[in-house]
A protein has these predicted regions:
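Conserved serine/cysteine hydrolase catalytic core
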Residues: 214-271, 276-279
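Alpha/beta-hydrolase fold catalytic core
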Residues: 1-59, 83-86, 124-125, 303-312
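Active-site loop/oxyanion-hole signature of alpha/beta-hydrolase fold enzymes
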Residues: 42-45, 87-131, 297
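A catalytic-pocket lid/entrance helix-loop region that shapes and gates access to the active site
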Residues: 157-185
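Conserved hydrolase catalytic core segment
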Residues: 126-165
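Conserved alpha/beta-hydrolase catalytic His-Asp/Glu region
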Residues: 182-236
Length: 312
């Protein structure tokens, strides 16, 4: 694999987007409008986000546990290829990506929700669509439990409140590994081992976005490793939130993912008979990485139409 040069020489945050486009066959006409911004939390911390497009953002995308805003990069490029006038925000959850860590290391959905709401109001005040993947989906439910009228549509990506440690065992095994790696090769090798269906090129990009290099050449993940375990049954209140929501709800499920099972889908439909359930064939838990074009197409079909709420 070969050791990469120091990040100061090799890594420019948005310099890898052309590679994203090439890998999935998207035309590359130069870097789109994209910038990193921050929102200040009430306690002085900052929540970081990637803002795509040049108009008022109409959607907020939230990644999963141990990921970051760049997990959406290929999806974002496909969304803009479909409609260059779109604008949206992909946030880094607290303790992830470029967002600051919390002193209490509490990154449960209900703890994340107030921060994400502050960031959404600051960076995407007119956004109407909320898209949450895994922990981001649970955070979305917690947010809507606090502010049920803030968004007009919710799309959950391979997650329900029925998730439990058994369903997420492979994810937990990966994220509970070493906190420091001797080299880039070492951290990349572990990532490849746990993601056998993904290309080395895509995982290399993912590691560059999601890890940092130290002066001695060692690497560590950007996420805060000091996270408490989620107690069994602690997500049950989010089922109640889901059932009480009146906005349109879509669950996008990966056909090869163990995280959402048939019982979860049945419970979701029992509580929300009008909910839409879509299965993406060949996708695992991280549908945005496994089948980004298919996910982008699904999002495009459910994208908010322009309205007075979106005008400057």
């Amino acid at each position: 694999m070969g050791r990469v040069p120091p990040m100061s020489e090799a890594y420019e945050e948005f310099g890898l987007l052309a590679d994203n486009a090439r890998e999935v066959g998207l035309a590359w006409n130069g870097r789109p409008a994209v910038v990193r911004r921050e929102a200040r939390m009430r306690d002085g911390r900052t929540l970081s986000a990637v803002v795509w497009g040049s108009g008022p953002p109409s959607a907020v995308l939230i990644h999963g546990r141990s990921q970051n805003a760049h997990t959406w990069d290929t999806v974002a490029l496909a969304l803009l290829a479909d409609d260059a006038n779109r604008a949206f925000v992909a946030v880094d959850l607290p303790g992830h990506g470029h967002s600051q860590w919390k002193d209490d290391h509490d990154y449960r959905a209900e703890a994340n929700a107030p921060d994400v709401l502050v960031a959404a109001d600051a960076l995407a005040p007119q956004a109407r669509l909320l898209v949450g993947m895994s922990l981001g989906g649970l955070t979305s439910l917690a947010l809507l439990g606090d502010a049920p009228k803030r968004f007009d549509r919710l799309i959950l990506v391979d997650i329900t409140p029925g998730v439990n440690p058994g369903k997420g065992r492979a994810i937990a095994e990966f994220t509970s590994g070493p906190e420091r790696f001797a080299s880039f090769d070492e951290i990349l090798e572990r990532t490849l081992r746990y993601n056998p269906g993904r290309s080395e090129a895509s995982l290399r990009r993912g590691v560059l976005h999601n890890a940092r290099e130290f002066p001695d050449g060692s690497w560590s993940w950007r996420w805060d490793p000091g996270r408490p375990a989620v107690a069994p049954g602690s997500l049950a209140p989010l089922w109640d939130v889901l059932g009480e929501l009146t906005l349109p709800l879509t669950l996008v499920r990966g056909s090869a993912s163990p995280v959402v099972d048939d019982d979860d889908v049945a419970e979701l439909v029992r509580r929300r008979p009008d909910a839409e359930v879509v299965v993406v064939e060949g996708a695992g838990h991280s549908i945005q990485g496994d089948r980004p074009l298919e996910l982008a197409e699904l999002l495009s079909a459910r994208w908010p139409t322009p309205s007075a709420r979106e005008r400057p």
